[in-house]
């Protein structure tokens, strides 16, 4: 698939560098559309025809983005101090793509660690850094074997898979796709829900990935794959061998305070009402927040901000935080 530059690199800007990349060949779609039975009234063919027409209407080009440079990753090290090894790996890939016309290629990664330590939050922050989209696929609640690869148009209720949707219906050729809790993928599904990953996690075969519904090759080689798990023992070895594996530890108490302070500043800066809130949180508020898993900190802060404003105050106090969260430790710290 082809790509060409859209935004030239210029010093002093933090906007991502973007170019356009084709994620499918229109001639393939036109050929498939022509072969459909013109007079068929079967819903599956109508749905398939609609997908082909939509593909041709939108065209094949999508944004392919990458960070302007390594310095713009510095903030993530402050926000995600327990993900240093993962960020170092991404940083190496950014260095390879910097000062070149090449797109950013990131080796698929598996983030191993207990629930609540910020694995999904990391994925969101990485997507934001890259300027691309993030698609979350929670495997623990998905039972369909065709989740990633789509189901044949011959089947009732057939539809494209999530990879096809992310690339064809989305705006980016290199979205972040998070396969959350991959170790909990259902083993009772009629088809292996992880089967498509054998080709999707390999750069060469991902260049011509075929969704079973559309049966048109799409270029999924630029997708940034992040998988998460609590335990790697339930993941097939061939999939593990296709990824860089990182064991993410719970943050230390000091790191947890830093995460809480970063979330406080980020939420405040992201809302107009933030100007009514003190720029810095109180120390005892940070101490309280630092006892929570990162995934709970944001919810607690939003409650705290709201309670402070209900009382017409600019300062968030410990009493403003949720009682349950403020009253007990919820995270195992690294000492």
Task: Give the label of every model feature segment.
Residues 179-218:
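Conserved catalytic/switch belt of AAA+ P-loop NTPases
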Residues 311-335:
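C-terminal engagement/docking regions of AAA+ P-loop ATPases
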Residues 62, 171, 232-238, 249-315:
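Conserved C-terminal "switch" segment of AAA+ ATPases
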Residues 104-139, 168, 237:
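Walker A/P-loop
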Residues 154-178, 210-217:
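Conserved alpha-helical scaffold flanking the Walker A/P-loop in AAA+ ATPase domains
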Residues 129-159, 166, 256:
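AAA+/P-loop NTPase substrate/partner-engagement loops
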Residues 17-71:
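Interdomain "pre-motor" coupling segment immediately N-terminal to P-loop NTPase/helicase cores
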Residues 67-112:
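Pre-Walker A (pre-P-loop) alpha-helix and adjacent loop at the N terminus of AAA/AAA+ ATPase modules
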């Amino acid at each position: 698939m082809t790509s060409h530059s859209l935004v030239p690199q210029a010093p002093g800007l933090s906007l991502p560098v973007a170019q356009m990349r084709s994620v499918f060949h229109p001639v393939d779609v036109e050929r498939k559309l022509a072969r459909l039975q013109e007079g068929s009234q079967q819903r599956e063919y109508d749905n398939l025809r609609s997908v082909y027409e939509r593909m041709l209407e939108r065209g094949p080009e999508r944004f392919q983005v990458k960070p302007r440079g390594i310095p713009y990753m510095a903030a993530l090290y402050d926000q995600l101090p327990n993900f240093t090894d993962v960020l170092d790996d991404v940083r190496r890939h950014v260095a390879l793509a910097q000062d070149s016309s090449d797109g950013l290629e990131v080796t698929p990664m598996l983030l191993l660690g207990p629930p609540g330590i910020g694995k999904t939050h990391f994925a969101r922050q990485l997507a934001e850094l890259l300027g691309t989209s993030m698609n979350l696929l929670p495997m623990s609640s998905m039972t369909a074997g065709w989740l990633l690869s789509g189901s044949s148009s011959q089947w009732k209720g057939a539809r494209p898979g999530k990879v096809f949707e992310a690339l064809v219906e989305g705006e980016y050729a290199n979205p972040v796709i998070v396969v959350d809790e991959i170790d909990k993928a259902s083993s009772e599904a009629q088809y292996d829900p992880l089967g498509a990953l054998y080709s999707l996690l390999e750069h060469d075969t991902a260049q011509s990935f075929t969704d079973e519904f559309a049966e048109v090759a799409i270029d999924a080689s630029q997708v940034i794959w992040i998988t998460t798990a609590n335990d790697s023992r339930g993941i097939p070895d061939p999939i593990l061998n296709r990824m860089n594996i990182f064991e993410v530890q719970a943050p230390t108490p000091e790191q947890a305070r830093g995460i809480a302070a970063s979330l406080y500043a980020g939420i405040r800066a992201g809302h107009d009402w933030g100007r009514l809130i003190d720029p810095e949180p109180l120390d005892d508020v940070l101490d309280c927040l630092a006892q929570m898993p990162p995934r709970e900190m944001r919810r607690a802060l939003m409650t705290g901000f709201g309670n402070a404003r209900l009382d017409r105050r600019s300062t968030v106090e410990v009493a403003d935080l949720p009682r349950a969260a403020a009253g007990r430790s919820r995270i195992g710290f690294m000492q």
